[in-house]
Amino acid sequence: MNKQPVVMVVDDDPDILDAVTTILSTQPYAIVTARDGLECVDKVRAQIPDVMVLDLLMPKMDGFAVVRELRQNPKYASVPILILTSVREDASRRRYELETGLAMDVQDYVEKPVSPQDILERVRNLLESGRRETDSREAP
C-alpha cells in the first residue's frame, strides 16, 4: 500500500495556514504545518515532505532563507516547493518579490488570494512531477 504524500504548509498567518490545511485535507495527504521558517527547517529534518507550500514573508526565517537552506543540503534539495505569498505593499515591492521568487529554485509560484482548486491542482502537479523524478532516479 502506498504511503500518503506528506505536504508541509508554512505560513505565519494562522488564517492562511488553517485555510490551506483545510483545502489540502480534502485529499489523502498527511499534512504538516509550520508557522515560520525555523520551525519549517526543524520539521523537514524530522520528516522530509513530498511537497512544500511556503510563504515568503515570515518572522524568524523567511521563505527565501528556507529555500536557500533546503537547496544547500542534498538530502532536501529535491523537495518541490510551491511559493504561496501576498504582498500588501506598493507595486515596486510586489514586483521585487515576484522577480526574486521566480529566480529562486522553486517549482511553482502563486500569489494570494488563490482558489482552492488552484492550490489542489498545483500541489497535485508537484506531487506527480516529484514521483516521475524519483522514478527516473531509481530506474536502472
What positions do the PLM features span?
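Active-site residues of response regulator receiver
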Residues: D55, T85
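Alpha4 helix (beta4-alpha4-beta5 surface) of REC/receiver domains from two-component response regulators
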Residues: A65, R88-V110, Q117, E121
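Acidic catalytic/metal-coordinating carboxylates
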Residues: R35-E39, D62-R68
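Two-component/phosphorelay signaling modules centered on CheY-like receiver
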Residues: P14-V32
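Active-site beta3 strand of CheY-like receiver
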Residues: Q47-V53
